[in-house]
Structure formats: C-alpha cells, structure tokens
Regions:
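Interfacial aromatic "cap" segments that immediately flank transmembrane helices
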Residues: 6-8, 12-42, 115-142, 156-207
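Hydrophobic alpha-helical transmembrane segments in multi-pass membrane proteins
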Residues: 32-55, 77-97, 130-155, 193-220, ...
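Membrane-helix interface segments
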Residues: 74-75, 79, 111, 126, ...
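N-terminal start-of-domain structural block
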Residues: 5-83
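Juxtamembrane transition segments at transmembrane-helix termini in multipass membrane proteins
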Residues: 2-5, 13, 17, 58-65, ...
C-alpha cells in the first residue's frame, strides 16, 4: 500500500480520488457489469420468447386470452418463471454490488483483484448483504416517516454498510452499527459529502434524461411529423442520447461504490489510525537504508 493512500483526505480529495479510482478500475467493473447484464438480458429474452410463443399459438389474437385452455397454461408458465426470474435478479444484483465494492477496496489497499475469487467471496456474503439491505430499507423508511428530510441523514449513516461487510466481515446487524459508528465520528462532514456527491451525480443524470426524453418530444411537437429529415434527426438523436445515458448510468453506479469505499477508509484513517501497522513495517524496512546513508 502506498503511504500517500494513508493520508486523510478532505472532500475535494475524496471527489478527485473517486473519479481516478473509478476510471483506473473501469475494465474490471465492465467485466462484472457484463456478467450482470448478461444474466438480466438472458432472462428477459427467455420470458419474451415464451410470451411470443403463446401469441403465435393464439394467432396473435388478444381475445384468445379469455379462453381457459390458453390463459391457464400461460399463467401456470409465466408466474413461476417470473418468480424464479425475480429471485435470480435479486441474487445477481447483490453479487454485482458486492463485487463492485470489492474491486475498489482491493484497489485502495493495493491488493490484486480476481473475478473468480471475488465472486466466491461475495457469494459467501450473500445473506449478510441481503439481510443488511432489508434492515437498511426499514431504517430509511423510518427516516422518511419521522421527516422527509430524515432520509438523507439515514442514508449517510448506513452508507458504509457494504464496505464494512466486504472488508471487516461483519454480519448484517453488526455492519449497520459499525457504519453508524464510523459515520458518527464526523457525521456532518460525511452527511455534507454524501449530499454533495448525490447532487453532482443526479444533476448529470437529469441532463441526460432531459436530452433523452424531453428534447426529442419537443422537436417532434414543433415539426408535427411532416419533415422526414427531422424525423431521422430525432431518431438518431434519441438513440445517441439513450446510449450516453445508459453509459452514464453504468458509470454512476461505479462512482457511488468508489465514493463510499473512500469515505469508509478515510474515516478509519482519520479516527482509528488505520494503516499504522503498515507504516511501522515500512519504516522498519527502510531503516537499514537510512543507516547506510549516514
């Protein structure tokens, strides 16, 4: 681990390092994302193929759905399949999220990241992450019920749950209490950092959403569909904007992971002397070199 990594960071340093550590690990992140996207895409195609198959069997007639011999087999097929698909999606989403955090944790502490070992490790933490996610959901709901403004403080307090689970190997309840403790060392600074980061990420997201949803609609309303060149332009513009929005959404999830990992380690460095053993070892190793230079 580089000694520079163990220096406490201010908000500017955290934001700067968030982008640097995200882009430096983008290849690893894309590899994990492709696994996640591949599973989701495969499930979607399977369900779509079944629905199309039933439509072909019915002669593309919606009225046939009212017939028991068509409706019953359709429901008996699609409902269990949908339940299985939801379970698989939840599983793969948890694995995907955990592996993202593992990538950035390994990057920060200077350890090599391996896809297979990361997948196995995060899979072993599946139920911990799942239960912690449910508990965090109720905590956020509690913040909403107390006051809408209470959502952001609750998000800040539980923001370090995943880094705690992945790095410190705490259980579901222990990870939440540990996250509360780490954030409470400097609650207002962490809360301000989280709010600012959310504003930055969501502002860029809104810009892409405006480009993808509203601008083509406005242009189409002005043109009234009479100009073929305008229709082509709107179609190309919509596709390009959608691709950019999708790419940014992928980037945003990586940025969130990197940001919370850096907040986690920064709190440990500032308030718990994280890395003292490493610095002591490095000083011991460097000492003979210093003696030779005297």
């Amino acid at each position: 681990m580089n000694k520079e990594e163990l220096k406490p960071m201010d908000l500017g340093g955290i934001l700067d390092k968030t982008f640097r550590i995200t882009f430096s690990n983008m290849k690893k992140y894309i590899k994990v994302f492709l696994m996640y996207f591949g599973v989701i895409f495969g499930i979607t195609l399977l369900i779509l193929a079944i629905v199309i198959g039933f439509f072909i069997a019915m002669g593309f007639s919606f009225e046939s759905f009212s017939e028991p011999e068509i409706l019953t087999p359709f429901l008996l097929t699609i409902i269990p399949l949908s339940i299985i698909a939801i379970i698989i999606i939840i599983f793969i989403a948890i694995i995907f999220t955990g592996m993202i955090y593992d990538i950035f944790i390994k990057s920060f502490i200077g350890e090599e990241w391996d896809f297979k070992s990361s997948f196995k490790y995060v899979k072993s933490k599946f139920w911990t992450i799942f239960l912690a996610g449910i508990l965090c959901f109720f905590i956020i709901i509690g913040g909403y019920l107390m006051c809408c403004i209470g959502i952001l403080p609750m998000i800040a307090l539980i923001s370090l749950v995943l880094p705690v689970i992945i790095y410190e190997k705490e259980n579901a309840t222990g990870s939440i209490s540990r996250s509360f403790k780490l954030v409470s060392y400097s609650f207002w600074k962490v809360l301000g950092s989280v709010i600012l980061f959310i504003i930055i990420v969501q502002t860029l997201s809104i810009v892409f959403q405006i480009g993808f949803q509203f601008l083509p609609f406005m242009l189409q309303s002005l043109d009234s569909g009479k100009n073929i060149q305008m229709i082509i332009f709107i179609s190309i513009f919509t596709i390009v904007t959608y691709i950019l929005y999708l790419a940014y959404s992928i980037l945003a999830s990586a940025l969130y992971g990197a940001f919370y990992v850096l907040i986690f380690f920064n709190q440990k460095i500032k308030h718990e002397n994280f890395g003292v053993e490493f610095l002591a070892d490095s000083i011991t190793v460097d000492q003979p070199l210093d003696d030779k230079t005297k």
